[in-house]
């Protein structure tokens, strides 16, 4: 299995400004595997310490702040060798170990020669507490579910993955590539990007095992809900989680608390929702009132949409059977195209630094699915789950903000093309959106300069 984050980890290893690393990511997204694989590839050895399996290791951090003594105790207790610069030290399951997290300050200041990477489930929750980590003394990195490109690599389709990365001009994709990529994307909607379900499909072609793996992950997340410090929030978190398919099945996907429970109010459920956001199990996309910078200044905090961390988990949570794979475009269009919108949001979050927003207006109603910030430009994005689409909302957006729109972006089942200032990106190329937008801007500017 190939994870593209390994390249980022190598950059971290080689950086002259390297600090201890905290790798964030949801449960079972592949944090431990990635760090061990990184150590195997690029270090002489790896020293792995799991604080859930060996709770006694925590004591070494509670009795001293001397990093040499801490490492000596860990080596003696575990029998593992640690050599500066040559050993990758992995501290795993550190979410309940504030002393371990805080010790990164001393490793950064007093022992930068040691390469240390920390990981843990629900780290977003732990790090949301002000005193839980040493500000400025660690590097952060986020690992997300496998992208469609990574899915292709895991499935043995290196040729298709290389082709996607080789596209360097905005022109239609040949049928020899378009058709198989379209079929592979349908399968990605079924498996999602969590490594275990992907493995069940790519290595064993076992649909039942894949379904069980997805159910197991969902079950693990639901058990984590009980870890909220205020136990009364547990049922609220669970109700919000289970309402997500219903929220996304509506024509207007704005999150409504009444869908969670009849009569529910924001003040009763907002803490529970924030727990899910901090855990990164859901993504919260605010409504923007206008395409301005900074984007947060234009947020309507009372209006937002919620998406799941992974499209495969959403399919499983919605109880949509894998047999939909063989039913034409059903996976793309089912419950108002929610899977497609969730999939596109996943890809945008990994490519752009600023979390996407959406835009809408009433009377008459128009909605642009996402607004993305690329450098200092805002691009409206529309997601269509079918081919031969029209973009009324993109047209309206340009009418209202003509000076703010350099390019409009549409994801659909249509082929790659640039039609005036509308860039259509096939859904299977969503991973390449940032690069394709850059190519489209160059192509558009080149045409403009040729007119003079």
Where are these regions (language model features)?
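Short regulatory helix/loop adjacent to the ATP-binding pocket of P-loop NTPases
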Residues: 124-140, 152-157
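Pre-Walker A adenine-sensing motif
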Residues: 2-16
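Structural recognition of the conserved hydrophobic beta-strand(s) that form the central parallel beta-sheet
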Residues: 90, 115-121, 142
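Conserved lysine of the Walker
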Residues: 31
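Short glycine-rich substrate-engagement loop in P-loop NTPases that contacts/grips substrate
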Residues: 53-84
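Conserved P-loop NTPase "ATPase switch" module shared by AAA+ and STAND
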Residues: 82-99
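A cross-kingdom feature that marks ATP-driven nucleic-acid transaction machinery
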Residues: 13-21, 28, 37-41, 271-452
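Interdomain hinge/linker elements that couple catalytic modules in large macromolecular machines
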Residues: 153-346, 356-363
């Amino acid at each position: 299995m190939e994870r593209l984050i390994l390249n980022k980890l190598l950059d971290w290893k080689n950086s002259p400004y390297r600090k201890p690393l905290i790798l964030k990511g949801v449960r079972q997204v592949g944090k431990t595997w990635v760090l061990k694989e990184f150590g195997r590839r690029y270090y002489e050895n790896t020293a792995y310490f799991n604080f859930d399996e060996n709770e006694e290791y925590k004591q070494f951090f509670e009795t001293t702040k001397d990093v040499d003594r801490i490492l000596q105790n860990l080596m003696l207790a575990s029998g593992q060798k640690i050599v500066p610069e040559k050993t990758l030290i992995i501290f795993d399951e550190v979410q309940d170990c504030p002393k371990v997290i805080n010790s990164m300050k001393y490793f950064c200041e007093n022992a930068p020669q040691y390469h240390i990477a920390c990981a843990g489930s629900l780290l977003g929750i732990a790090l949301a507490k002000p005193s839980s980590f040493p500000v400025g003394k660690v590097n952060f990195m986020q690992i997300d579910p496998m992208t469609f490109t990574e899915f292709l690599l895991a499935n043995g389709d290196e040729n298709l993955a290389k082709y996607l990365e080789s596209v360097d001009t905005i022109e239609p994709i040949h049928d020899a590539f378009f058709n198989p990529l379209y079929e592979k994307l349908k399968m990605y909607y079924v498996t999602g990007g969590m490594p275990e379900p992907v493995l069940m499909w790519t290595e064993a072609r076992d649909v039942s095992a894949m379904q069980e793996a997805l159910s197991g992950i969902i079950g693990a997340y639901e058990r984590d809900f009980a870890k909220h410090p205020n136990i009364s929030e547990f049922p609220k978190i669970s109700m919000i989680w289970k309402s997500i398919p219903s929220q996304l099945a509506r024509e207007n996907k704005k999150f409504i608390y009444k869908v969670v429970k009849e009569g529910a109010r924001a003040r009763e459920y907002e803490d529970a929702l924030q727990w899910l956001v901090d855990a990164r199990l859901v993504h919260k996309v605010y409504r923007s009132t206008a395409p301005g910078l900074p984007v947060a200044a234009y947020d309507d905090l009372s209006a937002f949409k919620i998406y799941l961390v992974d499209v495969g988990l959403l399919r499983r949570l919605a109880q949509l059977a894998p047999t939909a794979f063989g039913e034409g475009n059903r996976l793309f269009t089912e419950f108002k195209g929610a899977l497609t919108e969730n999939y596109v949001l996943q890809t945008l979050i990994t490519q752009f630094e600023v979390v996407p927003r959406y835009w809408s207006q009433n009377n008459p109603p128009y909605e642009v699915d996402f607004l993305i910030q690329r450098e200092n430009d805002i691009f409206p994005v529309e997601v269509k789950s079918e081919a031969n689409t029209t973009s009324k909302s993109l047209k309206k957006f340009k009418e209202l903000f003509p000076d703010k729109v350099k390019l409009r972006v549409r994801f659909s089942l249509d082929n790659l093309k640039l039609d005036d200032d509308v860039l259509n990106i096939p859904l299977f190329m969503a991973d390449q959106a940032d690069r394709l937008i850059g190519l489209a801007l160059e192509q558009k500017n080149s045409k403009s300069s040729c007119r003079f």
